[in-house]
Amino acid sequence: MENLTLVIPAKNEGSCLPQVLDELKKFECKKLIIVDKNDIGTISAIENKNCEILKQKTSGYGNALIEGINHVKTPFMCIFNADGSFDPKYLSEMLNKIVEENNDFIFASRYLQNAGSDDDTFITLLGNKIFSFIGNLFFKF
């Protein structure tokens, strides 16, 4: 998986990001952490981990994604959460699928059949269903 870069935006994630990076050690891919330039706690927590740290020029999650994506040099990338909410065991499967089926991109969702999340409540699920339905009315692919 050396042809894959994980783009990991992080802000105030010094307490959990080191464990996420430890879990990602077994995957031979690049780990690009985009950190708010003033977030000394996160930077110091991960500076000895096997990752590249990119300090954001402009603040905000969207800007972190843009700056990170613009920095990627590998043919494939994955936007990965810094808080450990994604299970990396699916990375190989998703990368194989994109290569074998010649896809341009893949979306993963915890709301697909046989997927889920431990932190979803009934209200969260109901709200997501309603907003997805409304979004599909206007932006159906």
Residue spans of the language-model regions?
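Acceptor/aglycone-binding surface of glycosyltransferases and processive sugar-polymer synthases
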Residues: 57-59, 63-70, 76-79, 88-141
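Active-site acidic Asp-centered loop
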Residues: 36-37, 80-82
